[in-house]
Amino acid sequence: FEFDNNGQMIPPTTRQGVFANVVRQPNLHDQILLEYGLRYVFFTDADSLDCTLTAPWFNNSPWQKTATMVPARYDIGKWFRAVNVEFMLDPGLKKFTIKEDEPLCYFGFGTEKPIEFIRFKMNDELKRYSVACSTSTSWDSWVPLANRYARFKETRMKQLVLKQIKENLVDG
């Protein structure tokens, strides 16, 4: 990814690569906040399970010399949304590269039990649920995440999400 002096993304010159987006103005001077164009969605039928996103600190990925990954954590048993992988570029940096097969991030799950990953199609209904959760801070600002979790449970959103997931499983 390459940017001009105004922080605007310069279109790639090749067809290889992954989409990215400058999602919002950075909070720090002369640093670009970049959202990587690959999102992950995790959800569980368990009551509660923390999912944590961190940088791949054991791998010494070259991109870590020029940017910092924004960590994230939420309860995938109480909330349904895509995980955005975001990078804060170092001050003044106008070019950011991640090489093929280079570790992007780590996902951790707060359990000692084995986890079974099951693929599902993200249909329009699931997209609406995910967008509602991920944008809730804009239409319901200053409400703590714990309160959002409670509302998610009270409105039986979990059952609606699980029903849609079960109807849209991808064969292995």
Outline where the language-model segments fall.
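DUTPase catalytic domain/fold
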Residues: 1-172
